[in-house]
Amino acid sequence: MDSHPWIPNSTREIREKMLEKIGVKNIDEFFNDIPRNIRISKEEWDNLEIGLKKPISEITARRIIEEKLSMNKVFVPLLFLGGGAYPHYVPSVIKYLISRGEFLTSYTPYQPEISQGILQALFEYQSLMAELLDMDVVNSSMYDWASALAEALLMSLRVKKNKKKILLPSNMNPIHKRVVNTYLSPHNVRIEYVNYNHDTGLIDLEDLKNKIDNDTAAVYVQSPNFFGYIEENAKEIGEIVHDIDSLFIMGIDPISLGLIKPPGELGADIAVGEGQPLGLGLNYGGPYLGIFATRMDMKLVRQMPGRIIGLTRSVDGSRAFTMILQTREQHIRRAKATSNICTNEALSAIAAAIYLALLGKSGIRKLAELIYYRSHYAQARLREIGLNTDIFKSDFFKEFPINFDNIGVKYRYVHEKLLENNIHGGLYIGNWFPELGETALYAFTEIHTKNDIDLLVEKLADIINELKR
């Protein structure tokens, strides 16, 4: 008997041959790695009471489904998680515009003559981002911050061919660190970590000077860093890096650039970051938007990963958008390509372009100021109830670490108590940075009102007072 026309390998004979090739006796053995207590056997499946048993109307089906869903405990908590993904407000117009058929497509615009709309939108994203970063060339997106950083380091190794060492901050985002290690593991490269100053939470300049040498291809610095603090020595770090002819890579939060100096002004050769705050929402962790930019040096531009959209003229003199410098990408031999990121995050980039266009220059600045002041208000209020909000003596943008060692319990207990009050507390970072003890990273954005912050303080004070009894 032939396989089902729409379901491949659906006959018993084909399945048995596949299992024999794999080296297992039957389907149950194939799924042995899955714990038995969460598996359903064939007999259990055959006897399972599922389905509605008879055709029903759409409205009846809707009522049944809503009744089932109402059994879930669903709440929208106050969310104060930091660490790389943030609860920012997403204007409703963004979802409406990116849902248009011209944008909401998996089509990769390799035929520019019939893709002018989407190519222009991506060109606008690049232009807006270049202005925000004060950088010359921006690609039209990477997967996320972590992949953008890893690609920037690979790009540095291609540009500085005879240098085989990378310097990273020891207090970088631990998730980014894992991604970077995965990307660089097949390459002949040494990764060393520069210590952070335990008073300021910033890069230890003396340790950087001791570890940087003529074999260093690139140095990466994040500002605001993983702890939320603004790297006030970024320009000096860039000068140290350039003195030995290495590349200076900066990681940024795009909204923070409404207040602090952009990477281009600080001397960065490459800038990377996360576009999630620019109208994307949390999205259960993705899709996000990797920001990637470089200064105008063709040695750098030709080694950039991802695609670049350019503006040119057609044969009849009309304005035309097209993908440029494509010989860097997957159109050439895979081993020679600068990266193999293909469809990437074009829709996310268009959403970010809409967001930036909506806010404009003054809007970005006002938003950054609002976030800065609210986060500092939160720090002052939390200090009032006896929490250590001054682990490091530096200025921060929208998140900062809070130490809970002095209340006598693990942070997990505090977090669970907050959840009982529909408050999702900060991200515990003591497992990544054990020297900080029971410490969590709390973030505050424009969605957190003064009343929200006061409520958080009130509930934390209640927890502390209860523990003192």
Curated annotation (Swiss-Prot):
It holds the Pfam family GDC-P. The glycine cleavage system catalyzes the degradation of glycine. The P protein binds the alpha-amino group of glycine through its pyridoxal phosphate cofactor; CO(2) is released and the remaining methylamine moiety is then transferred to the lipoamide cofactor of the H protein. The glycine cleavage system is composed of four proteins: P, T, L and H. In this organism, the P 'protein' is a heterodimer of two subunits. It catalyses: N(6)-[(R)-lipoyl]-L-lysyl-[glycine-cleavage complex H protein] + glycine + H(+) = N(6)-[(R)-S(8)-aminomethyldihydrolipoyl]-L-lysyl-[glycine-cleavage complex H protein] + CO2. HAMAP family: GcvPA. This is Probable glycine dehydrogenase (decarboxylating) subunit 1. Its EC number is 1.4.4.2. It comes from the Archaea. GO terms for molecular function: glycine dehydrogenase (decarboxylating) activity.
